[in-house]
Swiss-Prot record:
Keyword terms: Magnesium, Transferase
Summary of the function given for this chain in its UniProt record: Catalyzes the transfer of the 2-phospholactate moiety from (2S)-lactyl-2-diphospho-5'-guanosine to 7,8-didemethyl-8-hydroxy-5-deazariboflavin (FO) with the formation of oxidized coenzyme F420-0 and GMP.
Catalytic activity, EC: 2.7.8.28
Stored HAMAP family: CofD
Pathway(s) per entry: Cofactor biosynthesis; coenzyme F420 biosynthesis
Family, per entry: Belongs to the CofD family.
Organism annotation: Methanospirillum hungatei JF-1 (strain ATCC 27890 / DSM 864 / NBRC 100397 / JF-1)
Names of required cofactors: Mg(2+)
Catalyzed chemical reaction(s): (2S)-lactyl-2-diphospho-5'-guanosine + 7,8-didemethyl-8-hydroxy-5-deazariboflavin = oxidized coenzyme F420-0 + GMP + H(+)
Domain of life of the organism encoding this protein: Archaea
Protein name stated in the entry: 2-phospho-L-lactate transferase
PANTHER family in the cross-refs: 2-PHOSPHO-L-LACTATE TRANSFERASE
Assembly, per entry: Homodimer.
One MF term in the entry's GO annotations: magnesium ion binding
Length: 297
């Protein structure tokens, strides 16, 4: 079994390539929940949903979020009633959020809810929230602290930030299922997701770093030069006082990583790194990258 640590954009592209080489049942994905948010009566787990929709064959791969071909009737009406609405959520996607919220209110864990949703959509891959406890990512601005979703979706990252914080300010416990997925893995792959808001929250869960220290870990940088392939990783890395490039990512992951992969076009020099084509513009490129990664096992 191969276990991935994933956020919601870069790593799912790699997972798309992995599916062409491995049975879904041989893949486990530990997913960031630091960006989860209660919103308009639903509970959104954006990264969990992206991974789940991918394996269900439902993901809109034009945007890498939401359901392919979804309608937006509810969103259109809500915009007239609640003009401050800043998330464009499709109707089928919203139904998942509402169901998740109802189950959580009834006392189900996020892990159990995710299992139930995966069963409903016929997903055989093991998709695991990093924790059943809240660990929400906020950013600090001149006007106060705001949820990461508001920073990235409402403001498109166009506001200065001076800190990245988490609520509550204590390590969340990794679930037993997460620990088990790491222990059973032949290799753990840290995908090319945002290092600060997608991967660090997973690494912050109690027990995760200790388990990874016993495993072979391969990490893929999301940077090419001084910019990430997508998302606000550059500004977030600078806020964390790390270089906004692959050298910063390597330093952030420190001694957890056995093999560090960066793009063949990357101008940043990381000693000992493996150079591959990591710009996954097509499923074929993602599959080729995954094939190259598997040769490093």
């Amino acid at each position: 079994m191969i276990t991935f640590l994933s956020g919601g954009t870069g790593t799912p592209k790699l997972l798309e390539g992995a599916r062409n080489m491995l049975p879904d049942s041989d893949i486990s994905v530990i997913v960031n929940t630091g960006e989860d948010i209660w919103y308009q009566g639903g509970h959104i787990s954006p990264d969990v949903d992206t991974v789940m929709y991918l394996f269900a064959g439902l993901l809109n791969t034009d945007t890498w979020w939401g359901v392919r071909g979804d309608s937006f009737l509810t969103h259109d009406v809500l915009k007239t009633l609640l003009p401050a609405s800043y998330m464009s959520i499709g109707d089928k996607d919203r139904a998942v959020h509402i169901a998740r919220a109802e189950w959580l209110k009834k006392g189900m864990t996020l892990t159990r809810v995710t299992q139930q949703l995966c069963s409903h959509f016929g997903v055989s891959t093991t998709i695991l929230p990093m924790s059943d406890s809240p660990y929400t990512t906020y950013v600090r601005t001149a006007k106060g602290d705001i949820h990461f979703q508001e920073y990235w979706v409402r403001y498109r990252g166009n506001t200065d930030i001076c800190a990245v914080l988490h609520v509550p300010d204590e390590q969340p416990p990794a679930t037993p299922e997460v620990i088990d997925a790491i222990r059973k893995a032949e290799v753990v792959i840290i995908g090319p997701s945002n290092p600060v808001t997608s991967i660090l929250p997973i690494l912050s869960c109690t027990g995760v770093r200790e388990e990874l220290a016993q495993k072979k870990v391969i990490a893929i940088s999301p940077f090419i030069g001084e910019g990430p392939v997508s998302g606000p990783a550059a500004q977030l890395m600078k806020t964390m006082k790390y270089p906004a490039d692959s050298t910063g990512v390597r330093a952030l992951y420190a001694d957890l990583v056995d093999v560090f992969i960066q793009d063949e076009r990357d101008t940043a020099q990381v000693p000992g790194s493996v150079r591959l084509d990591t710009l996954m513009k097509t499923p074929a490129i993602a599959e080729r990258l995954m094939r190259e990664i598997l040769t490093r096992l």
